[in-house]
Amino acid sequence: MSAGEPGNEPTAEPTDEFTDESADHHAHTLEQFPEKLAVVRLGPGAEVPAWAESSSLFSVTATATETSVVCAMRSVPRKAKQAGPLIAFAVQGVLDFALTGVLSDLLRPLAAARISVFTVSTFDTDWVLVPVNDAERAAEEWRRSGHEVVIAVPVKP
């Protein structure tokens, strides 16, 4: 058959599909913070409570249906709706907004190890929070995947 005959059309290479998992993989350095954190659910439009503070990560996210606060577990009232304790890992350095696949690179090994995560992104970097009981296992999974994990020196935000 010649190239022009039916059944012998050239096949197009996929252009929008990610076919090689290692092609865009980048090794990252993660800083592991020692402070135990909590994610607290407040009502929509809630003010940030005076008790909400942290020495590593403090984040407020508000939507029409809720306000979530990430803060030090030690300061959260027992009656508050919360998840934790969690340990935070921050991607070291400032990430360019054009960089793709950072969270994918970091979450893939944790998903394979069945480690649950809560992620937060700031203007500069990404944070991955894991249950305190899974923190060392998460660090080991990252190391096995080519990432580096170092102990962070907390600086109060």
Specify the residue positions occupied by each region the protein language model found.
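A generic structural motif
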Residues: E66-C71, T125-P131
